[in-house]
Structure formats: structure tokens, C-alpha cells
């Protein structure tokens, strides 16, 4: 129900009643829009508005602007003619275009302020963090995000992206057509999620440090430490586990990433790392290298050894794992295939 008694304070000149102001706003909207809105008034309110409209004095443009501004302020604050601001919004949407409703309720200014805050917040992160997360996005999305950033910051982010992808992204940025508001909002919502993820990772410095330490250890030592940590705090252990990558985790790496990684590792290191490994790990590694290199390594592994130098094996395995972490941090490979890991855990 309309509550005219709460609709603002008297304006300068001959004071207007609340019904006068309502009549003025409706008349200013025009016949088409006003006609659609009138059905939402009670019979008593309609009688008051009609009576006021018949005797309404001439209202100067500046005074009318004040009335409309007053009307806008009331709805922007969520109060006014009706108790339910959402109901008022739905009333306006029936009679006005989306642009007119946005303008009336001050949404456009609010959205622009929100939009600006997104890009300001993104700039607060390190370029390396931003680049790392952007690599998961479609190249066109990356191009749009870079186009929205200041040139100096955008250039730093671009340099964190692998060189083979930069040309494509720059080309997309140069040839980018105007993005529709709907598409822009979808991307900007993704940017908000991106910011939240970046901030969460920045705040997880402790778990990252612990994982870095564990990544320097052998698997039995890591398993023991994780078990002890889980006894103390399951939450802490769950934060650390995803950041640990050991030689045995090669089994959970996507095939394409595994091929890229092992292509960077020498045959001597791989041979040493595979000594004493399970059949599954051996096949996982050997199936990801060239046939020629596989034959060489299999030939070396077939030569019997008097004793297994566990220290050298551990060093070789750590070298492979550290190279994997380095490539993953630069965005060149993915460490774990979640589906494969879950399947292994369920087995």
C-alpha cells in the first residue's frame, strides 16, 4: 500500500502534498507508463492522485527535478512509497525500459563503481599470481581481462604467460570487438572469483611453506609427517596435501603434462629415479617418453646391480618432482588429473 505521508519533505514555493508529488511524478512519466503504474494504487490513493492532478499548480523544471530526485533517493535507499522495495522495482520494470529503471534506481552508477573496484582489486595482486590463474581461462577471456587493466600492470601479467601463448592473446586483444554488457558481466563475475582465489592462496602462505618443505623429502618421510599433522589438525593436513607433489604422483598427472615434463628430464636421471619403482610407476613413465629413450632406459634397468643406492634414487626422484613443480608454477603443465587421483583413491 502506498504511504504518501512518508514521501519526502515539502519543497520550496507553495508546498506540495505527498499526493501532489505522486501526481507530478506520474505525469512526468507520460501517459503510457503512468497508465501501467496506476493499477498498483488502492482506490483511495487513486482518488487522492486524481484530485491532486486536477488542481496541481505549474511546477518549474528545477522543482520537478527535485521531486524526481527525491523519488529516486527513496528507492535507492530501499524505502519509500511501499514497504517492499522489490515490489516497487517490479512495478517500475513493467512500465519502463531496463535502461530507464537502471537510471531511476541509480543502478548504473553503482555497477560502474563495482566494476571499477574489481579492476582495482585485481591490480593489488602480484602479476605472477594473476597470470597463473588466467592460464586456466579461455584466451579470449584473458584478452578481455588484459584489455581492462592499466597498460603497465597488464604488460607485467602478459610476461608471466608462456611465450607461445602471448602472440595469440595479443592478437585477440588487438582485434577484440565491443563486448556485450551481458558477456562483460559474466567475465567480471569470473574475475571476482579469480580475485577471491588469489587472495585465498596469498593467505595460505603457511601451508605452502610446509608443502615446500615436504616436497624436499622422501615419500616415507612425507607420509609419516602428513599422518602426524592429520592427527593434530585434519584441516591443516587438507590444506597441505594438494600442494605436495612427489615422484609417485606422476601417475596422477595428465598424460600431456607428463610428456612435456619428461621431455625435459635426462635419461640418466629418469633411469636412476625408476630403480626400485613399482611396475605401475615404471610403465607410467616409460609410456610417456619416446620409443628410443624407452629402449635405452629399459636396457639400463635390466642390468643387475649389486645394491640399490637409495640416496641417489631419492635425489633423482626429487629432481623430477621439483622440475614438475617448476613447470606447473610457470603454467606450462598441470600437476594432477583430479579424476585419475579420485579413481585411484577409490580402488
Swiss-Prot record:
It is a peripheral membrane protein. GO terms for molecular function: cytoskeletal motor activity. GO terms for biological process: bacterial-type flagellum-dependent cell motility; chemotaxis. A motif (Part of the EHPQR-motif) lies at residues 137-140. Belongs to the FliG family. FliG is one of three proteins (FliG, FliN, FliM) that forms the rotor-mounted switch complex (C ring), located at the base of the basal body. This complex interacts with the CheY and CheZ chemotaxis proteins, in addition to contacting components of the motor that determine the direction of flagellar rotation. This is Flagellar motor switch protein FliG.
Amino acid at each position: 500500500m502506498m504511504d504518501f505521508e512518508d514521501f519526502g519533505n515539502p519543497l520550496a514555493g507553495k508546498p506540495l502534498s505527498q499526493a501532489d508529488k505522486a501526481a507530478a511524478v506520474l505525469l512526468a512519466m507520460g501517459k503510457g507508463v503512468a497508465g501501467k503504474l496506476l493499477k498498483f494504487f488502492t482506490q483511495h490513493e487513486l482518488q487522492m492522485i486524481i484530485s491532486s492532478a486536477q488542481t496541481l499548480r505549474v511546477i518549474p523544471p528545477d522543482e520537478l527535478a527535485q521531486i524526481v530526485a527525491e523519488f529516486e533517493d527513496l528507492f535507492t535507499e530501499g524505502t519509500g512509497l511501499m514497504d517492499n522495495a522489490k515490489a516497487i522495482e517490479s512495478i517500475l520494470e513493467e512500465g519502463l525500459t531496463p535502461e530507464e529503471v537502471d537510471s531511476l534506481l541509480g543502478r548504473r552508477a553503482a555497477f560502474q563503481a563495482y566494476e571499477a573496484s574489481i579492476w582495482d582489486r585485481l591490480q593489488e595482486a602480484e602479476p605472477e599470481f594473476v597470470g597463473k590463474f588466467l592460464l586456466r581461462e579461455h584466451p579470449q577471456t584473458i584478452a578481455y581481462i588484459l584489455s581492462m587493466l592499466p597498460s603497465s600492470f597488464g604488460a607485467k601479467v602478459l610476461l608471466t604467460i608462456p611465450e607461445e601463448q602471448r602472440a595469440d592473446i595479443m592478437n585477440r586483444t588487438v582485434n577484440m570487438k565491443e563486448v556485450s554488457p551481458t558477456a562483460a558481466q559474466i567475465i567480471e563475475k569470473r574475475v571476482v572469483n579469480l580475485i577471491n582465489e588469489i587472495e585465498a592462496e596469498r593467505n595460505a602462505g603457511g601451508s605452502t611453506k610446509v608443502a615446500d618443505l615436504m616436497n624436499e623429502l622422501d615419500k616415507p618421510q612425507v607420509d609419516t609427517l602428513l599422518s602426524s599433522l592429520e592427527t593434530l589438525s585434519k584441516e591443516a593436513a587438507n590444506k597441505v596435501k594438494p600442494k605436495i607433489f612427489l615422484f609417485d604422483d606422476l601417475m596422477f598427472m595428465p598424460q600431456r603434462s607428463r610428456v612435456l615434463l619428461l621431455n625435459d628430464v635426462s635419461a640418466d636421471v629418469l633411469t636412476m629415479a625408476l630403480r626400485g619403482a613399482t611396475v605401475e610407476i615404471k610403465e607410467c613413465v616409460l609410456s610417456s617418453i619416446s620409443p628410443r629413450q624407452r629402449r635405452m632406459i629399459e636396457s639400463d634397468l635390466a642390468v643387475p646391480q649389486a645394491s640399490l643406492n637409495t640416496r641417489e634414487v631419492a635425489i633423482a626422484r626429487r629432481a623430477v618432482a621439483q622440475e614438475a613443480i617448476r613447470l606447473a608454477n610457470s603454467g606450462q603443465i598441470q600437476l594432477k588429473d583430479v579424476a585419475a587421483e579420485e579413481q585411484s583413491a577409490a580402488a
